[in-house]
Amino acid sequence: NTNVVEYRHGGALCAISYNHDYEEEIQLCPNESHIITCIVTIGIDADGATLHNMDMQRRGSKKLKEEFIKVLDERHLDISNESLSKLVNLNLNMCYYFSLSETLDTKELVAMTSRSPRYYVSSAFWARDVYLWAFPSIVLANRKKARELLNLGYTRYRKNTAYHALYINGNILYPGFELDELVSVIIATEKYIEMTHDDTILEIPEYKDTVKEILSQLEDWYEPSLGLYRT
C-alpha cells in the first residue's frame, strides 16, 4: 500500500507519498543486514504525490537506480589520483544537487545557499554563493543548466542581486549592499564563456539590460574622493 502524509496550513502545502518495493517478511539474525528500498515522492497535493509514487513503483527501484548511476557516470571527471578523483566528484555532485532545485508548483529553477534547517538563511539565494562559488561546478556538471542559471541572474535576481541575501523569488531577505554580489553574475558569465566557448549569451537582451542595471547601481556607491566603491 502507498501511504500519504499531507502538510496543511489552510490549504495543502505539500504531500509526501512513500512505499517500498518488497512484500516478503525479512528475518535477520544478529550482525546481519538487509537493504530495503523505499520510494518517496513529493507533490503539492495527495493525488500528485501518490500518482508519482505509483509511476516510480512501476518502473522499479532497480531501473531507477541504473538510470541515476548512468547520469553520474556521464558526469564523472577522470582524474588519475584515485583519492582526489573521489573527492572532486563527490563535491561536484553535492554542489550541483544541493545548490539547485525546482519549485513544486511551477517547476521553475531556483538556486539556494543551503537546504539545512540549521542554517540561518536556509533555502535563501545568495549571489556570492551561487555565482562565485558553486557556478564553476554547475558548468562542469550540466552546461545547459548553467546557462539557465545565468538567465535567472539576468531576470529574476537582477534588481536585488547586490543585497546580502534574497528569497528564492528574488525579493530582499537581508538588506545590505555588497559589491562582489552585484558583479557576481558578470564574473560567472565570463567563467561560463571561458569553460564552454559559448559567447552567444552576450547577445541576449537580458544580459545587456543586466550590465546597464549594474552600472547604474554602481554609481550610487562610488566615492569620488577616494576613487573607490563602498560595500
Regions found by a protein language model. Give the residues of each.
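C-terminal ends of transmembrane alpha-helices
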Residues: 98, 102-104, 220-230
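Aromatic-rich carbohydrate-recognition surfaces in CAZymes
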Residues: 34, 57-60, 64, 121-226
